[in-house]
Regions:
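Bacterial Sec-dependent N-terminal signal peptides
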Residues: 1-21
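Catalytic-core signature of thiol
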Residues: 20-120
Length: 120
């Protein structure tokens, strides 16, 4: 038993005594990105993620930095879903959440709005 404890103590001492070096990251490619936005406690992650992707793509393509309104997209998506629910006589989906391509549907059919104009 003493041999096991002594061996364990020596192993722990050896591990602690090994040279510690600090790894430094190097930037291989730096991609521009828009600031992080807070969706609070809304079920709109689908919209925030997709709009963030579109903003990042605009930056990547050299089109400039945009801050697009996520809540404008959400509002128009819910209006469409309410109309759908009415046409289905109450059997449509009007709960939180949606899918990413609804952002492109709103973009194609209604358009997009800057955050400073429509902050929701």
């Amino acid at each position: 038993m003493k041999k096991i404890l002594l061996t364990a103590a020596l192993l722990c001492a050896c591990v602690g005594a090994s040279a510690q070096y600090k790894y430094e990251f190097t930037d291989v490619k730096v991609n521009a990105a828009t600031p992080v936005k807070n969706q609070a406690s809304t079920g709109t992650c689908w919209c925030f993620a997709t709009v963030s992707f579109l903003e990042s793509e605009l930056l990547r393509m050299g089109k400039g930095e945009y801050d697009l309104s996520e809540m404008f997209v959400v509002r128009n998506n819910y209006i469409r879903r309410m109309n759908d629910n009415y046409l289905r006589r109450g059997r449509g989906n009007v709960s939180q959440g949606s899918i990413a391509h609804m952002v492109t549907w709103v973009m194609d059919n209604v358009g997009l709005m800057p955050e400073e104009v429509y902050d929701g």
